[in-house]
Design a protein with these regions (language model features):
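C-terminal boundary and immediately downstream tail of ABC-type ATPase nucleotide-binding domains
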Residues: 224-244
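Conserved ABC ATPase signature
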Residues: 135-139, 143
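Conserved ABC transporter NBD signature motif
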Residues: 67-75, 84
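Helix N-cap at the start of a conserved alpha-helix in ABC-type nucleotide-binding domains
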Residues: 171-173
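Catalytic Walker B motif of ABC-type/P-loop ATPase nucleotide-binding domains
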Residues: 160-163
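Conserved ABC ATPase "signature" region
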Residues: 115-131
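Helix-to-loop junction immediately C-terminal to a conserved catalytic motif
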Residues: 59
Length: 244
């Protein structure tokens, strides 16, 4: 069985409800989907669609109020949260690095490892070896995002969750991160699930797309088809920018 034929992550009727203004709203509403290993998935939709809320349920940063997430056919609740997040890692809009050097940040997740090659992990995300001894506070946002990515990859995750990781970057840096994501997905057979508010970015990344509106999965398929020839009325309204 090839890399892309393996189903690595499933959601079944996944639901999350949160209190708001004295009532309860569903940020994720009965969402069922299967993710294959080694593919890139773009989660798109208008603001308030529940995209980030959905992402946070996949590695238990938040807990659902209904349904379940399965990782290799086992409920994610059967894994210790720390162990689960090593295999289903997440990067956020603003990268967080610990005080100290880049090397300190990389070695933080590597306790118990007999050998640690900072140069290798930096090169893998497109940074030169001399970055290892630079202070984390001296890096640009784009460089910090690469270091955060290198730190996640050291743990050899199967799934990488990305919550708008380029939203704070300039267009050139954003393109470089996009190219890096695609390269790593191919090289490592890594499943990438990325939330983006930018349809053009989703088109550049390609792969598969999921359109969410008001917590519901409206349609899914090839990203290019989803964003150029959607099959649903809500999909057409989203593409024509009627949904904000």
């Amino acid at each position: 069985m090839s890399c892309n034929e393996t189903i690595i992550l499933k959601t079944r009727e996944l639901t999350r409800e949160v209190p708001k203004n004295g009532s309860v709203i569903r940020t994720v509403d009965s969402l069922t989907f299967e993710f294959n290993k080694g593919l890139v998935y773009n989660v798109v939709g208008p603001s308030g669609a529940g995209k980030s809320s959905f992402l946070r349920l996949l590695n238990r940063l938040d807990e659902p109020t209904g349904g379940e997430v399965l990782y290799y056919d086992k409920p994610v609740t059967s894994y210790a949260p720390t162990d689960l997040r090593r295999k289903i890692s997440m990067l956020f809009q603003i990268p967080y690095l610990f005080p100290g050097t880049v090397r300190d940040n990389l070695s933080f997740c590597c306790s118990g490892k007999q050998e640690f090659d900072a140069d290798f992990h930096l090169r893998r995300v497109g940074l030169k070896a001399e970055y290892a001894d630079m202070g984390a506070d001296d890096l640009s946002v784009g460089e910090k995002q690469r270091v955060a990515l290198a730190r996640s990859l050291f743990l050899e995750p199967d799934v990488l969750l990305l919550d708008e990781p380029t939203s704070a970057l300039d267009p050139t840096s954003s393109r470089k991160i996009e190219e890096l994501i695609l390269s790593l997905a191919r090289e490592l057979c890594l499943t990438v699930i990325m939330v983006t508010h930018n349809p053009d970015q989703a088109l550049r990344l390609g792969g598969k797309g999921l359109l969410m509106v008001k917590g519901k999965l409206i349609e899914s398929g090839d990203t290019a088809e989803l964003l150029t020839d959607p099959s649903s009325d809500l999909g057409r309204r989203y593409v024509s920018k009627e949904l904000e």
